[in-house]
Amino acid sequence: MLSGTSGFSGFTSAFVIGTTSCSDSFLDEKMYSSYGPEVSDVNAKLVGLHRQYAAIWGMSSQQGFVGCWQVGTDVGAPGDTQGVEVPFYRYQELNAENAGVSFLWEKLYELINSANQIIASQAEGGDAAATAEAMFFRAYAYNMLVTLWGDVPLVTESTSIPRTDYTRNAVAEVDGVIDSDLVYAMSNLPVVGAAKNESRINQDMARQLAGEAYLRMGMRDASYFKKAEDAVTPIITGGKYELISARYGKYAAEPGDYYHDMFRWGNQRRSQGNMEAIWTFEMEYNRDVNGGTIDNPQQRRNWVPAFHKLDGMVNADSIGGRGNGRLRISNFVKYGLYEKGDIRNSNYNIRRVMWYNKLGFSKEVGIDAKGFLVDKDKGVRNVTLKTGDQVIPHEGDSLNVFYPHPTKWGAYDETDDFGYAVVKDWPVMRLGETYLLRAEARFRQGNTQGAADDINVLRDRAFKDYRAVAPGAGKVTADQIDIDFILDERARELISEENRRMTLVRTNTLAERIKLNGDMEPAAPSNKVITGFDANIHTLLPIPLTEIQLNKDGDLKQNPGY
């Protein structure tokens, strides 16, 4: 077992956390929850699984990690990149030493090991609901692993000593565990509203995960498409959820729209009026809640442009707080995806227009022939910009400072103007995606009318206001339904929420959808466009090199091409 090569090996070392006292550096890693024998309360262990989940998607040491799952696809383009995400669109640079690849692999196997320990502790006469919650997280982790890596080691028991003899198990074998875990979870988890906390795992969260997992499994065994439909239908028909189609919550009297209301801080939970929410991950602010805030989540700083670099702009909730502009939506999303009247493309949801908000701002500037901002006397005319005027960007601002962007992660905390961390809740699962999962399952079974019906439910919400002047706007018919239309609709509905890379890999469409991205030279710099993609290599990620090196007694083969 090599030590010191990467500092931490989640796969090999996760099985010995809390059981060994050697001084390998990975054991010095900060742990959010203890899974050793000194923890007797199973509920504390289950809460620990949630904190481990948060540690994955709330990581700040590699700020660009959020972008790894969006750039290099049809919907994402790089902004002011941090670095870890660059090989995910400059594919020729993607290798087995990428920090994002290693981090996700390690953290998923840590989550699996912790879940295995809970499952084992409840094996004889234990708490079925506790076992089910642990199985949910194990299924979540394995579903992500097989989607992104293909064949992976299957470990269903925790180990008290390090092992270096792992091999890769076939996807179908891992899928068997995912399936059985989710079947158990769907039967034994509490119903919505009955869990210890509204953010804890319930039956419908398991159903939603099962729907996604079964759709992936259906690509190799079509019988799973029916299982996907059957898994998610009770969420739709159970009467516990409804699509948000009217203003609600603490911002209802402010300018906005009902779709935007779902994603505003203090409006996201079911208890706050969001009856569309299935799983809203509660991101408690550690200023207000002891033990809150896992690391410093970077979603806002990725998705929100760096407006603070513009004269006349100050950080505020109305503009989403302080962003870094590391991640942009692609030209495909900006200019080719939405139809007229779609509320999901309103300025409250995809912000394209802004106004100078700094009190007392006034500045004389030049405007060039293209309408961009230049220095005074350097353009075709001069104008004086003032507070309340529409923002006019420089031509180069579109890569970092000012560009159309989704607002779902925006929020501003006046006690932290710098805004290093996301402090609002995370939208993980909601009813809008449930309809899309069922539409996909129905399409795969040849039921294009059923798929159109599901998508039209979403479009009835999206075009509700516009239909007052354009009746029938947004309606789709069965003959319009194919996998590309469904993927387009997922982008319209779930931009910045879904892991787009996972969606495209599980539908076997990554190679084709990349071609839609639309960001290309010379309009975009050569270091901001997708290059080097080879579907035979880059559809799957490389297994981290450190894992192969540590596994000296096994045959942990690398994916082809890496």
Language-model features, listed with the residues they occupy:
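Conserved, well-structured interaction surfaces
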Residues: 43-52, 57, 78-149, 165-176, ...
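Flexible, polar/acidic helix-loop-strand segments at domain edges
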Residues: 318-430
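Long, intrinsically disordered, low-complexity segments
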Residues: 21-26, 75, 108-109, 177, ...
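Short coil/turn linking the two alpha-helices of tandem helical-hairpin repeats
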Residues: 146-153, 216-222, 446
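Membrane-proximal, proline-rich intrinsically disordered regions
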Residues: 22-64, 549-562
